[in-house]
Amino acid sequence: MRLCSLTTALILLSTDGTHAAEDYCFGCHTVMEGTSLVFKDDVHYHKGLSCADCHGGDPKINDMNLSKTPETGFRRRATRETVPAYCGRCHSDPNFMAQVNPKLRVDQLALYNKSVHGRQLAAGRTEASECVDCHGVHNIRAVSDPCSPVSPAQVTETCAKCHVATAEAFRESPHGHEFTYDRRPGCVTCHASHATESATTAMLTGKDAVCVRCHKAGSDGAKTAAGIAQVLTRLETADPNAKEALARLRVAVHTFDMDAVQRAADSATVSPEAVRK
């Protein structure tokens, strides 16, 4: 992360003053909480966007009260519930995105709304992850930037902010070591980014399973996945209401170690004999 801090400093020193010269938002917010300094490191800033593109208002009026009115289109700070739609105003607009970054997909909001995180947020669970939890707020970086929290090098740590035990199990697993060596993104390789779904045994086995993308039928990896799926199915069958036990077992799945998975199953509230049948 020290390298990221150094990169930030260099960008701030090299950034031209075009935005600041035309935008009175920077005058106050540099002094108040430093938001504008952080924003100068943001991918949106470097694409020519300003505070007003998200927040509305008139940045050319040198009066805070006059610049932030309904007449100037000022928008209040987004809440957790409204952040996805807030970001989606631009990121779901193909015409706008074609001008800013035609390489970016414009279905990310639609995917998020259908995902487990999106459904939880829509159901009123405000602790569910939304855009800024993963991407940041005023210092958002391109995914290709190694300092971005959603870059291949950082994404596992970003997911770990919520999924602590699962990320720890993954880091020490064969996949964790291999992905680090190959500089491949961790969690999102299997779980996707915006279209994340609740984990099921279908991810482990079957023609549409995640595991078969890399592990051919009959390989050691495929056999391990099938064995893990069997243990999960047995516990689900033995006690469908054993939510805590199943949660612990799904964490253990990320070790990709049959012994660790079986130990987690044996520690379930139901009898080990029932799980092993």
Q: What are these regions, as identified by a protein language model?
A:
Residues 2-14:
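Bacterial N-terminal signal peptides
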Residues 1-2, 45:
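Accessible peptide chain termini
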Residues 16-277:
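Short sequence/structural segments immediately N-terminal
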